[in-house]
């Protein structure tokens, strides 16, 4: 599969990215290179290959570094106030951002 200029223009429009003709041409080359690599990876026979939890786990005994999914306070009240001072808009200790999705 290869992308043409129209495909790249459509992807850029969907991503709300404005590209010059030069950037569009470069993006087309890069995306086609990525798609070619994916095709090569898909062509590899992986029947009988055990899945890995970590890419190095086949060579080393690496424990999985998982943590509990729990809410924690990561910054002190002073640090939070310092960080929020950089926000153009804030409310109730949260950053306010403009709507970006229609």
Swiss-Prot record:
SS bond list: none
GO molecular function: asparaginyl-tRNA synthase (glutamine-hydrolyzing) activity; ATP binding; glutaminyl-tRNA synthase (glutamine-hydrolyzing) activity
Signal peptide: none
Broadest EC class assigned to this enzyme: ligase
Record's keyword terms, sorted: ATP-binding, Ligase, Nucleotide-binding, Protein biosynthesis
One GO term (biological process): regulation of translational fidelity
Pfam families named among the record's database cross-references: GatC (PF02686)
UniProt EC number: 6.3.5.-
Origin superkingdom: Bacteria
Reaction(s) catalysed (UniProt annotation): L-glutamyl-tRNA(Gln) + L-glutamine + ATP + H2O = L-glutaminyl-tRNA(Gln) + L-glutamate + ADP + phosphate + H(+); L-aspartyl-tRNA(Asn) + L-glutamine + ATP + H2O = L-asparaginyl-tRNA(Asn) + L-glutamate + ADP + phosphate + 2 H(+)
Similarity remark: Belongs to the GatC family.
NCBIfam families reported for this sequence: gatC
Assembly information from the UniProt record: Heterotrimer of A, B and C subunits.
Function: Allows the formation of correctly charged Asn-tRNA(Asn) or Gln-tRNA(Gln) through the transamidation of misacylated Asp-tRNA(Asn) or Glu-tRNA(Gln) in organisms which lack either or both of asparaginyl-tRNA or glutaminyl-tRNA synthetases. The reaction takes place in the presence of glutamine and ATP through an activated phospho-Asp-tRNA(Asn) or phospho-Glu-tRNA(Gln).
The name this protein goes by in its record: Aspartyl/glutamyl-tRNA(Asn/Gln) amidotransferase subunit C
């Amino acid at each position: 599969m290869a992308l043409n200029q129209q495909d790249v223009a459509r992807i850029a429009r969907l991503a709300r990215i404005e590209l010059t003709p030069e950037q569009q041409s470069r993006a087309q080359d890069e995306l086609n290179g990525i798609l070619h690599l994916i095709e090569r990876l898909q062509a590899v026979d992986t029947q009988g290959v055990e899945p890995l939890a970590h890419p190095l786990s086949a060579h080393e005994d690496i424990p999985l570094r998982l943590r509990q999914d729990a809410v924690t306070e990561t910054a002190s009240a002073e640090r939070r106030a310092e960080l929020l001072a950089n926000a153009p808009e804030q409310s109730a200790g949260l950053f306010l951002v403009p709507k970006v999705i229609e």
